[in-house]
Every structure is written in C-alpha cells, then in structure tokens.
C-alpha cells in the first residue's frame, strides 16, 4: 500500500512539473484565479466618447468601420457585437476582416453572420465553447487571438442600406513582454458552393445502388472547408446547408488530407457523424459545447440546416499543409448549397484566400440542379 501511494505521489509531481514547464513556454489561455495575472485588460468599443448614450456606430453602404487598431503584444479574448439594420440578409452583406502584425491580406475574412455560425443569413440562438448567439441577436466569440505587433479589425458594409446601429465590445490582454516564439495566429476563412455539383442527377434515393457503388478515395470533388499551407492546427468548422434536392443532405464523409498525402489519413462515416450526431440528427436541433446542429430542416428541397464541430479535444495538426473537406452526398452525388467558415491557427504568412464571393452570390438561393424534388425548391 505504501509503495502504491509513493508511486501515485511521483506521478502527481511529474504531472505538475510537466504542466509548469508547459505554462512557461505557451500563452496563458487558462486562468488560475489564485494568481496575479501578467497582463492589463483593455477594451475597444462603440461606447459614446461624450458619455451620452449613443453607444453605437452607423455604417454607410460601401463604408468600412474600424473596430480595433491596437499595438501588441496582446491577445484578443472576446468579441461582442449586435447589429440593427433594416436590410434583408445584412448578416451576409457585412464582412468581418482581421489583420495581424500589419499584414496586407486578412487572416480572417467572412460574412459577419457566417463567422458567428449564422450561415443561413438569419438569427437563431445557439451556444458553444467558442462561439454563441445570445438573446437577442448578440454575437459572441471567445477564440483566443494573439498578436505580436498589431491588430486591426474592420467591418465592411457591402449592402445597399445604412446600418442604423452597430454596437461592439472587444476585450484584449495587453502584455509587457513579447509573445513566446512560435506562437500561432488565429485564422478563419469563408467558403461556399452554390451549388455543389453532384456527379449525377439521375437518382431517386440516397441509397440507390448506383450511388452506393460509387467510390471516392481521392476527395477531388469534395466540398472544401480549408486549404492552408504552413504549420498549425485545424480547430473546427461551422456550416450551413440549403437543400436543392429531397432526402437527407448529410450522406457525405469528412476527409482530411494532411501534409500533401494522396489519401486522407482522417476519414469519417457520414456528415452527421462528423458533427457528432447520428441518424439524420433524429430530426431535432441540439447544441453542445463542442458540437451540434442548431438548425435541422426538413429533408426536402428548400430545407435548411446549420451544424458545427470544434476539435478542442485534439486539434488536427499539420506541419506543411491541410486540405479539409467533406463529401456532398455519398461520393458527391448530391448538389445542395453549402456555406462554411473554417477556424484554425497557423504560423504566418498564410496562403492566399479564395476571392470572397460577391454580395449577390452570397445570398441563399435554390439552384436548378435536377434530381428528386428540385422543381419544388422555393426561395428561402
């Protein structure tokens, strides 16, 4: 018994030393509330500088609002935004961009709503460890976003009407010493396929023999969440779907190709499985800290869904590159619309982002792709 206790004590001491060593060389993203912190908390906000109650900004069409323009070293820890706009789909028409250390191309570029998991262009409540939408229409991000020299955050109004009121509070830690060497930078990238192009429209059910017999090992026609070059790790994805065809949209598998591999070393068994549900989500919405489906639509043309998954248990690491994808239907037989934002950390510089689709292209619209139920698709 004494020997067992000593062994257990040795294990505890070893773990403590390992943790202490880790903490000395990594950013303090976890707070020990019993210890004095080594940062100064700062905030930039839309608060009325006069002390009156006009605590918002307006954004004219075609204008850019700078939310943050701060020197480092620092780490953004929380973003809160709420918007009042009369324009339909303003969540698709406002674009969030974040630039680190005076870079000329953004490390974050996405429609405002999509960044916060509202890829359908409509508000709905949901909650996770990293992103949430509170009542009413309150957008929150808790991603840690370090910067060594400088951080600049902007929102562009690419719509046709003025944003009547744009409120924001951004909290960040200001450090007196440089960030640790090798610190990875936060990135987020929007992509869409409106529509995905399935290899056939001649099918009636997802399980038709000609569909099930089709094989896909190289993932060349998969929907792409992310193509990134450099060293880093993939943290997760939010995705929304507008169905152009009847039936369950989520027969496609997730496939991750790491460091240029020809065949994915990480491959899944179905879309709802990747998002940690099962059996078409049972037709019921749900959201938890790391995964969920806040919107589960009818399995028909015109149906809408929103899903998310965060890999905080084990981010997907890469040393040279990552190609993160998902099939659209089994072996890519379906032609639904996908809208997504991938979130990851990596060394700079990052690879060029795809050109952001135009405002008109970002608005959800059903597409004439053929297949079951396609003629019944209606504008959302």
Residue ranges and their predicted role:
Residues 24-380:
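Beta-strand-centric surfaces of beta-sandwich/beta-rich domains
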Residues 7-20:
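Bacterial N-terminal signal peptides
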Residues 1-5:
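N-terminal secretory signal peptides that target proteins for export/translocation
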């Amino acid at each position: 018994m004494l020997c067992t206790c000593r062994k257990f004590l040795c294990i505890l001491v070893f773990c403590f030393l390992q943790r202490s060593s880790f903490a000395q060389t990594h950013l303090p993203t976890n707070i020990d509330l019993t210890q004095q912190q080594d940062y100064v908390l700062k905030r930039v906000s839309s608060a009325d500088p006069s002390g009156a109650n006009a605590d918002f900004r307006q954004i004219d069409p075609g204008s850019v609002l700078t939310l943050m323009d701060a020197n480092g070293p620092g780490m953004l820890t929380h973003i809160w935004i709420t918007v009042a706009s009369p324009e339909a789909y303003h969540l698709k028409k406002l674009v969030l961009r974040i630039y680190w250390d005076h870079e000329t191309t953004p490390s974050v570029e996405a429609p405002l709503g999509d960044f916060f998991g509202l890829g359908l262009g409509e508000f709905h409540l949901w909650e996770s460890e990293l992103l949430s939408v509170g009542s009413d229409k309150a957008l929150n991000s808790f991603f840690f976003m370090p910067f060594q020299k400088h951080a600049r955050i902007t929102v562009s109004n690419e719509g046709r009407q003025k944003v009547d009121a744009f409120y924001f509070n951004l909290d960040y830690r200001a450090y007196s010493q440089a960030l640790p060497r090798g610190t990875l930078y936060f990135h987020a990238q929007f992509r869409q396929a409106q529509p995905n192009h399935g290899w056939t429209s001649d099918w009636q059910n997802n399980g038709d023999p000609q569909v099930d017999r089709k094989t896909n090992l190289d993932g060349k026609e998969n929907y792409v969440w992310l193509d990134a070059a450099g060293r880093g790790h993939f943290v997760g994805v939010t995705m929304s779907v507008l169905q152009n065809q009847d039936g369950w949209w989520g027969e496609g598998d997730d496939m991750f190709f790491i460091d240029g591999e020809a065949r994915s070393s990480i491959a899944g068994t179905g879309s709802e499985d990747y998002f940690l549900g099962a059996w078409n989500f049972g037709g019921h919405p749900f959201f938890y800290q790391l995964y969920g489906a806040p919107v589960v639509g009818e399995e028909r043309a015109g149906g809408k869904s929103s899903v998310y998954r965060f890999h905080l248990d084990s981010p997907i690491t890469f040393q040279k590159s990552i190609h993160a994808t998902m099939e659209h239907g089994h072996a890519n037989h379906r032609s639904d619309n996908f809208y997504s934002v991938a979130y990851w950390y990596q060394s700079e510089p990052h690879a060029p982002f795809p050109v952001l689709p135009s405002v008109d292209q970002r608005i959800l619209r059903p597409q004439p792709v053929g297949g079951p139920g396609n003629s019944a698709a209606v504008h959302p």
